[in-house]
Amino acid sequence: MTTQSYLSRQVTLTVQGQRLGGLAYVPRTASSTPAPLVICCHGMEGSHTRVAPMARRFAAAGAVAICFDFRGGGGSASQGETTAMSALTELADLEAVLTAACAWPEVDASRVALFGLSLGGAVAALAAARHPQRITALALWYPALRL
């Protein structure tokens, strides 16, 4: 498989009045030809660093890849309390990232995938069910499907 070079940049959004942070990995070729989008979701006690290796692999394969911290996540670049986290607050975070990233000029918004680990997998599945017209692929790694 041919790998592509990519740039990394910090991502900051405001969701329900709180900061949400993470990283985006953008293939250099996406500036001239929009690329598919993959949003990577970490598990309950994790942070974006847990799924960042997968995001970098997706970027090397030619996709714009984002890994972010759910608000309240452990070691989080985002605001919020862990005790306030739920699948629904994480779903709101994911939907905010999805909406923002689909507006980026580097992203082909007709090709969007979600990757989720553990609780992030359950949240990714919820988002895919809620937005079937926007999300075209779903990859779940040990998803917490019994909520």
Positions of the model-derived regions?
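N-terminal cap/lid segment of alpha/beta-hydrolase-fold proteins
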Residues: 1-31
